[in-house]
A protein has these predicted regions:
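Short, flexible loop segments at the rims of nucleotide/cofactor-binding pockets, characterized by
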Residues: 15-17, 90-94
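Acidic, PIN/NYN-like endoribonuclease modules and their adjacent C-terminal/linker elements
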Residues: 103, 109-144
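Phosphate- and divalent-cation-binding pockets in alpha/beta enzyme and binding domains
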Residues: 47-48, 82, 124-125
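Alpha-helix capping/helix-boundary segments
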Residues: 9, 44, 79, 101-102, ...
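Short, well-structured N-terminal submotif of metal-dependent ribonuclease cores
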Residues: 1-39, 50-64, 129, 140-144
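Short active-site oxyanion
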Residues: 33-38, 68-71, 108-113
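Acidic catalytic patch
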Residues: 68-91
Length: 144
């Protein structure tokens, strides 16, 4: 089991004023206390590298966290097959390609918690995997 961060969860770590920053940090601290990996798909990083200032902040964050149980999971053929399988099982188009990366990183570990700002799409992708929990970064709004 591992904690997996999607792009918005990583963005929260880059901005101390982000509403989910504290929630993500607490989850990372809990994972470390339990000696669990914190995973980020490198495909997720592609969503975040958006210019010099942001790139530097992201690289600094990754450097700070790298020695402390952080797993940067590259997309090799094995992960690519898993991502393709997730999309196929969910009857999803390539529009969910980026969302499939963090789910795949959790699935390959045998399960985990994925923190995300997009719980509906990730829950759709993770539906066949009972050991993957999708944790929304923001509380759900009540529907009327």
């Amino acid at each position: 089991m591992r904690l997996v961060l999607d792009a918005e969860a990583v963005s929260a770590l880059l901005d101390p004023r982000h509403p989910a920053e504290r929630k993500v940090r607490r989850a990372m601290e809990a994972a470390r206390r339990l000696r669990r990996e914190v995973g980020i798909a490198t495909g997720t990083l592609a969503e975040l590298y958006r210019g010099a200032g942001r790139d530097q902040a992201l690289d600094a964050l990754l450097a700070r966290e790298s020695g402390d149980g952080l797993l940067l999971r590259d997309t090799d053929r094995t992960l690519a097959r898993l991502i393709g399988a997730l999309l196929t099982e969910a009857h999803a188009s390539s529009a969910l390609f980026a969302d499939a990366h963090p789910v795949a990183v959790a699935v390959e570990a045998g399960g985990g918690v994925v923190q995300t700002a997009d719980p509906d799409d990730l829950a759709r992708l993770a539906a066949p995997y009972r050991t993957v929990v999708i944790e929304p970064l923001a509380p759900r709004r009540s529907q009327r």
